[in-house]
Amino acid sequence: MELHLTPRLKQRPAQAAACERYVDRLPVSSELRSELLADPSMPASAGISIDPRDAQAAIEQLQSRLSAREPAKGETPEPGGSTYGSVGRRFSLAYGNPQVAGEPLLKRRPDGTVHVDTGPEPQRSSMVPRQWPPHIVTGWVRNTWRRMLGRPPVPETWDTLHDGPDAEGKWHPAGSHRRWFLLGLVVAQTTLATYFMTKVLPYHGADLLEIAILVLFAVLFSWVSAGFWTAMMGFLVLAKGGDRHLISRSAAPDAPLAPDARTAVIMPICNEDVTRVFAGLRATYESLGRTGHLANFDFIVLSDSGNPDLRTAEVDAWMEVCRAVGGFGRIFYRWRRHRVKRKTGNVADFCRRWGSKYRYMVVLDADSVMSGDCLATLVRLMEANPGAGIIQTSPLAVGRETLYARVQQFATRVYGPLFTAGLHYWQLGESHYWGHNAIIRVKPFMEHCALAPLPGRGPLSGEILSHDFVEAALMRRAGWGVWIAYDLHGSYEELPPNLLDEVKRDRRWCQGNLMNFRLWLKQGFHMVHRAVFLTGIMAYLSAPLWFLFLLLSTAMLARHALVPPEYFTQPYQLFPTWPEWHPEKALALFSATATLLFLPKVASILLLVRQARQYGGLPRLVMSMLIEVVLSALLAPTRMLFHTKFVIAAYSGWGISWKSPPREDAETTWGEAVRRHGSHTLLGLAWGALVYWLNPSFVLWLLPIVGSLALSIPLSVMLSRVSFGRASREAGLFMIPEEALPPREIVETQQHVEQATETPNFVDAVVDPVTNALMCATASARVVQPASAKERHAALVQHALTGGPRALTASQRHILLGDPFALSKLHELVWGSPLADAGWKNIRLLVRRAPNVLPLRPRVA
């Protein structure tokens, strides 16, 4: 918030100046201001000598006047004192008297306390995780042994969980045939490529080193082949206009929503950019309001923020958004005191408190934005498909301006539809769930998707990090379908702004996927979701495998350069084995592999020829694709080293910290780039020098790897620049339709961000009369407290008063924010006590300037 010094502070008596400064921070009329300050004990003339302690008495009297009632003689005073008694009046002066279902938002309780409910009325139910089933082999051995002993097999509790109506849907035979076809394509293509690889090697796979190279090549090539055929089938599906099993075609686009199809739009957040979070939430809410279906939805922000400043800002932002859109009773907020199990615990806490009130829930990320039409369509699809447990949208990446992010937005927008359509083609109703921008059927989710910790010790045990794949597998195990509505429009997200922020996110995902792989052979899961676990780990395990493949290839080169050839490799061999080098075969195999990587991108361009104008025109679209291919090749070795490090770290027991990703266009500094990429540069230079020393002609083969590593520092810095991103947009490169013609929801989100004022923090919650009233009203007031708790809180108030804001830890600040009596008492003391630390006094000397944008404060009383 913008602050300035008040002009009324010159030569005023201590108690009068304090009261004037206090009233100046309240949105009151001049008449009410005069009424509050009119008191014989607060003279207006200067130069009168008054005991400084009178300032505290004057503040107390001012609080009594604000509370609009003076306690009669012998009457029990307001709980928490006169300052707490003024909370309701201060709240009403600032925010008016909002109504929720005909009742005032600010409720006055019989015990004298006031409270603002920020969440829905609780309707508690249970959500209990089940123990993980045994390994397939373990279960088979155990039951086989029991049969040999004449005992019945142990009943499998998870076999009784198939209560979903879509255990074997009409789509299942088609899906089974398609997956076998995919497996055949991958195996055939990998076998052929591995055969040609044996012809490239000098001894054709006759020694251990070459056998190891062949094994790694087969694994890596099969991974590339699976991606290639997924994209190709996606191309065919999109070219012919869609799949006949497409779930988005199962409901009429204008079908009315049933009144009992109650849906909660939940947004779990943790230490996020508050302005961006509530701007996106507001844009989504307003878009839904334009559809006329707002009555079916509630919006709930679920905060796990551990920063007291952000907690204060979130409550203030919730209030302002509700006032701006009339969202009281529709938009809710909850701050979780016991922040356990990260996002899964936050969602589970929602399910236990309010899940039984809703049939569906839509999960959003902190950077998610969805259109009202998309939300309404998701509910229609759920209603039309009673066997669907999860329907995942394919969110479009928008909103970033760095060159790196714009390239990634272009890639996901142009190539992404091929891969998501291909995934849908193979998976159908046994698909992915990505944790956000998806709708979930609440009842089966609560019954089957509670996550038990993984047994054991170490970083790959305990609470599951990457919960989404596991929840999809559990939902499908129970007989409910999991679908991707890849052609559904109106779902948006944001990407990391630079390479280093992307790999920070990848480290969390890497460890989460490695943990999930422990469930790969657990009993009860469907084969498709076993494949999902496998592809999840291969997304990161392929990096160290590729690195090892390159190291072994370098070792083979060193052996042939430094060690005399061995012509007799087998006992009693009659004829020598001559090493053969066939550069033309190696080039052909390299070209074939590059084609598998490059052809899906060309196919994507072919699909967009008619829409090329939305991408800057066909020439710029093709140029953008070519530049993206080059940049991807340059970044691939750096990503390889990062992912290799993450895999090694996970298996070595190195812990990770789970921090929220940046929600703004953060640029990489040269210092950070040197720290993070310095070892990559040295490795690239040393590796290239070694190969040149061994055989100069082989440097060209390795140049794309070592050259990229040598350039990793400037590449990382330059790609993170916003100026380069904007220049590329002005040149018409990396354009996407959402930039050429931005959706209304994205435009409004940006407008709300730009119009927002500075958010309040913990110090404002203590000092500012309005923010203090808001935080006191939204906290839970407990009139009856143990004497020990009262003593601790009273001591904390004195410690905060004399020590100032810097003397308080985060946990102490949260204690004060959670106790409205202590918070209001500290508020009174920092205004009136001579013992107040200078940190409080400096803030107290400032007056909030009236905001000039959204109506953050109502008209004066």
UniProtKB/Swiss-Prot annotation:
SUPFAM superfamilies: Nucleotide-diphospho-sugar transferases
GO terms, molecular function: hexosyltransferase activity
E.C. number: 2.4.1.-
CDD domains named in the record: Glucan_BSP_MdoH
Subcellular location, record wording: Cell inner membrane
Residue span of region Disordered: 65-89, 101-129
Pfam families membership: Glyco_trans_2_3
Basic and acidic residues bias spans: 67-76, 105-114
Membrane topology summary: Multi-pass membrane protein
Superkingdom, natural source: Bacteria
Cross-referenced InterPro entries: Glucans_biosynth_gluTrFase_H, Glyco_trans_2-like, Glycosyltr_2/OpgH_subfam, Nucleotide-diphossugar_trans
One record GO biological process: glucan biosynthetic process
Chain ranges passing through the membrane: 181-201, 208-228, 532-552, 589-609, 616-636, 698-718
Annotated pathway: Glycan metabolism; osmoregulated periplasmic glucan (OPG) biosynthesis
Family the UniProt entry places it in: Belongs to the glycosyltransferase 2 family. OpgH subfamily.
Biological role stated in the UniProt entry: Involved in the biosynthesis of osmoregulated periplasmic glucans (OPGs).
HAMAP family, A to Z: MdoH_OpgH (MF_01072)
Name of the featured protein: Glucans biosynthesis glucosyltransferase H
Lineage, highest ranks first: Bacteria, Pseudomonadati, Pseudomonadota, Betaproteobacteria, Burkholderiales
